[in-house]
Amino acid sequence: MAGQKIRIRLKSYDHEVIDQSAKKIVETVTNAGATVVGPVPLPTEKNVLVVIRSPHKYKDSREHFEMRTHKRLIDIVDPTPKAVDSLMHIDLPADVNIEIKL
């Protein structure tokens, strides 16, 4: 697979879980003999939801809820077949969204 690059994007609501997953991916691929660039922290996406507390009136009383989506980027430069195989068999938590592009 000379000249190719695998790009992995991780997304999660919990920053500790995403950092552990990124570390696990980097260790697994490095042990398989490929070179890794990252994990690169991407900007955190912040989604704010504003809800009126009262069901009828008192519009000035509002509650703010916030969802933060943490993102990381990992590039695998010149992946070996062993690295790709180990990447496919890695166990990661369910709350981490993974996108893999060749």
UniProtKB/Swiss-Prot annotation:
GO biological process, one term: translation
Domain of life (superkingdom): Bacteria
SMART domains in the cross-refs: Ribosomal_S10
Alphabetical list of PROSITE patterns matching this protein: RIBOSOMAL_S10
GO CC terms in record: ribonucleoprotein complex; ribosome
Keywords attached to this entry: Ribonucleoprotein, Ribosomal protein
GO MF: structural constituent of ribosome; tRNA binding
Family: Belongs to the universal ribosomal protein uS10 family.
Quaternary state and interactors: Part of the 30S ribosomal subunit.
Function: Involved in the binding of tRNA to the ribosomes.
Protein name as catalogued: Small ribosomal subunit protein uS10
